[in-house]
């Protein structure tokens, strides 16, 4: 399936905005290591599960927790430290733009539906276990299968560009207050 044209409305339209609170969990680690596009994975709840698979955009904000560090094992056997966001800096705690993929990631042949938030910001540390509040303001495109990793990366970068252009509009800026 070819990438469809994306038409972003002048302002969010029903059913948006969708506002969610969640916690960042570890995924497979491929967003950072393989694609150079890190993601904050979040559990799929009933509200997210009802959305069409595909790419969405909106705003998000991280909040650290005061829980102690803990070591958890990913499904691939690698251990990760849940620091609950305690190393986040002030700049990391601002409301930031995001794109979110909801779906099966056909390129990676996932067996479970995943929700992956790419926060458009450079972080110095991981923040597994941190709280994340976000709003979904619109839909960019359906989930697609790719024949190459390069094509996937190119499309993700286009999604990011589209999201940033949409979120720069005054009507979308008003939703920055999470």
UniProtKB/Swiss-Prot annotation:
Gene3D superfamilies from the entry? Riboflavin kinase-like
Q: Pathway listed for it?
A: Cofactor biosynthesis; FMN biosynthesis; FMN from riboflavin (ATP route): step 1/1
Q: Where does Mg(2+) bind?
A: 39, 41
Question: GO: which molecular function terms?
Answer: ATP binding; metal ion binding; riboflavin kinase activity
Q: Where is the active site?
A: 116
Q: Has UniProt tagged this entry with the keyword Kinase?
A: yes
The UniProt catalytic activity note for this protein reads: riboflavin + ATP = FMN + ADP + H(+)
Q: Pull one GO CC term from this UniProt entry.
A: mitochondrion
Question: What EC identifiers does the entry list?
Answer: 2.7.1.26
Pfam families the UniProt entry points to: Flavokinase
**Swiss-Prot/TrEMBL keywords:** ATP-binding, Flavoprotein, FMN, Kinase, Magnesium, Metal-binding, Nucleotide-binding, Transferase, Zinc
Which EC class heads this enzyme's classification?
transferase
Q: Any note on cofactor binding?
A: Zinc or magnesium.
- One record GO biological process: riboflavin biosynthetic process
Cofactor(s) this protein requires? Zn(2+); Mg(2+)
- KW Disulfide bond (keyword) present: no
Q: Which InterPro entries match?
A: Riboflavin_kinase, Riboflavin_kinase_bac/euk, Riboflavin_kinase_dom_sf
Q: What does this protein do?
A: Catalyzes the phosphorylation of riboflavin (vitamin B2) to form flavin mononucleotide (FMN) coenzyme.
- Please give the PANTHER family that the UniProt record associates with this protein: RIBOFLAVIN KINASE (PTHR22749:SF6), RIBOFLAVIN KINASE/FMN ADENYLYLTRANSFERASE (PTHR22749)
Q: Name the family the entry cites.
A: Belongs to the flavokinase family.
UniProt protein name? Riboflavin kinase
The gene coding this protein: FMN1
């Amino acid at each position: 399936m070819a990438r469809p044209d994306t038409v972003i409305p002048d302002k969010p339209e029903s059913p948006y905005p969708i506002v969610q609170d969640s916690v960042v969990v570890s995924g497979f680690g491929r967003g950072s290591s393989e694609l150079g596009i890190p993601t904050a994975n979040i559990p799929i709840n009933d509200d997210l599960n009802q959305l069409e698979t595909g790419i969405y955009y909106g705003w998000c904000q991280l909040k650290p927790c005061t829980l102690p560090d803990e070591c958890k094992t990913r499904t691939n056997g690698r251990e990760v430290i849940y620091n609950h966001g305690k190393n986040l800096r002030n700049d990391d705690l601002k409301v930031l733009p995001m794109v979110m993929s909801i779906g099966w990631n056909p390129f990676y042949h996932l067996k479970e539906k995943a929700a992956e938030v790419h926060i458009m910001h450079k972080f110095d540390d991981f923040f597994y276990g941190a709280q994340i509040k976000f709003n979904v303001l619109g839909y960019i495109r359906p989930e697609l299968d790719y024949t190459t990793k390069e094509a996937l990366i190119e499309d993700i970068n286009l999604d990011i560009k589209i999201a940033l252009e949409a979120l720069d509009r005054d009507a979308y800026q008003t939703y920055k207050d999470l």
